[in-house]
Amino acid sequence: LDDIVEFTGRVFSNINQISLMGLESIGWARKNWSSIFVEHDSYSEKILSAVETAQRSGIPLTIFNYPLCHLPERAWGFATQSISDWKNYYPKECDECTQKSFCAGYFSSSKGRFHQPPRPII
C-alpha cells in the first residue's frame, strides 16, 4: 500500500488527496466476501505506513468508512465520517464508545456477518 502511495506522490503531480476506502459488502463483494475480506488487524501497520508515506510526499490522505476501533490510534486523525450518513450503522456495542460521534461506524449493508465485532473505545 505504501508503495502505491509513494508512486502516486512521485509520478502524479496533480494529485490533491489519496483516499483509503473501507470495503462495502454489496454486490460482487458480498457474494465473494469469504475470499476477499481481510481482517483489519492484519493490515493496520500497512495503513500507518501509507499514512506516513503520504505525509512525506506532502499529499493529504483520508481514510473513509473504517470504524475507529479497527484502526491504529495514530491513524484516527486521518479517518473521517462517511459523506453518506444514511449508510452508517452502529451496533449496540458502540453506544458505550467515547469516540462514536467521531467514528464512521460500519456500513449499514454490513449488518450481521459482514463486519468485525465492535471494540468500544472507553
Predicted regions, residues:
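Radical SAM enzyme [4Fe-4S]-AdoMet core and its adjacent flexible, acidic
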Residues: L1-F78, Y89
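Flexible mid-to-C-terminal extensions adjoining Fe-S/redox cofactors in radical SAM and related proteins
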Residues: P72-I122
